[in-house]
């Protein structure tokens, strides 16, 4: 399975094409719209979320509520485009109109300046439009399709925020994936500890008043993943490496860890390695899950625990200093519409890219033309692993 996305932040629409989805997968536009709605939620979101109510149009690859095995095309209209018809026009326009929303004061921490250097733009809006997090709309749409595949295979996925701008959120021990999903869904800030809810919301309000932004750490957990996805035989076959690339490809994400992650550098081997157990009922399990469900670049049957760190959003309402690319004189950076934080929304994006990567890996290992073949192949593999 593979996909491409296209579209600009203020262009007419966003598009994704997905290839390799088996025939027979139940899929409706509403399945995708539910995920798009989640992405637009969360405390601290800006005015763009009031303008856009994202809804997908499926224009290929689905008939009578099921996938056909052909490429799937997804489109989401940008309602805000009506205010940008001249600025984002495909055809050439007058120079006076071109300069109307030209960006020449790049924002520190954004793709503006380096994108202009790379592609030789004199208007940095070209960098901004495609590098905008608006693109993640389609990654969530693609992820919604991937989640339907995972659900058919009894694989469940959830995310929650564990660090909010330096404030660590205590997570109760022993929560299942379903419990994490339920608790995070009930929280406006996607945390599982409801006692911290009002504190975090007040903190976001203060950051907004300060004209600043905050980042944090998001944890995605996946249950029901069969052992043996990924491989140790080549560096680019390791599934944890593929997931790391997928997570860090999300706008503003700067790092990823699995299980205890970077804490492993402070612990002894006897404190980190997960002892192997076996029972007639469950087959092979681990006493702990410090490695986050991975050994040798492969899934080991335990829940996957993946954390991604998101830097603060680079657009500040009290902008940092930059340089005018025409005069090279010091100048305050451009201010575009932004949020004090997008952690809850980013969690949905992270969940989506993890789901897409896992679905792709499953279809690589259990190559199938239709869902019945896929479900039978995965069930057979699970039985084999349990009785190994």
From Swiss-Prot:
Pfam families: Chorismate_synt
PANTHER family membership: CHORISMATE SYNTHASE
Sequence similarity: Belongs to the chorismate synthase family.
Source organism phylogeny: Bacteria, Bacillati, Bacillota, Bacilli, Lactobacillales
Keyword Iron: no
GO molecular function: chorismate synthase activity; FMN binding
Subunit structure, as described in the record: Homotetramer.
Chain residues that bind FMN: 130-132, 251-252, 296, 311-315, 337
Pathway info: Metabolic intermediate biosynthesis; chorismate biosynthesis; chorismate from D-erythrose 4-phosphate and phosphoenolpyruvate: step 7/7
Protein's UniProt keywords contain Ligase: no
SUPFAM superfamilies associated with the record: Chorismate synthase, AroC
Example of a GO cellular component annotation carried by this entry: cytosol
A GO biological process held by the record: amino acid biosynthetic process
Protein's name in the database: Chorismate synthase
InterPro entries found in the cross-reference section: Chorismate_synth (IPR000453), Chorismate_synth_AroC_sf (IPR035904), Chorismate_synthase_CS (IPR020541)
Keywords: Amino-acid biosynthesis, Aromatic amino acid biosynthesis, FAD, Flavoprotein, FMN, Lyase, NADP
Top EC class, one word: lyase
Disulfide bonds: none
Known cofactor(s): FMNH2
Cofactor: how bound: Reduced FMN (FMNH(2)).
Annotated EC: 4.2.3.5
Functional note: This reaction introduces a second double bond into the aromatic ring system.
Binding, NADP(+): 39, 45
Reactions that this protein is recorded to catalyse: 5-O-(1-carboxyvinyl)-3-phosphoshikimate = chorismate + phosphate
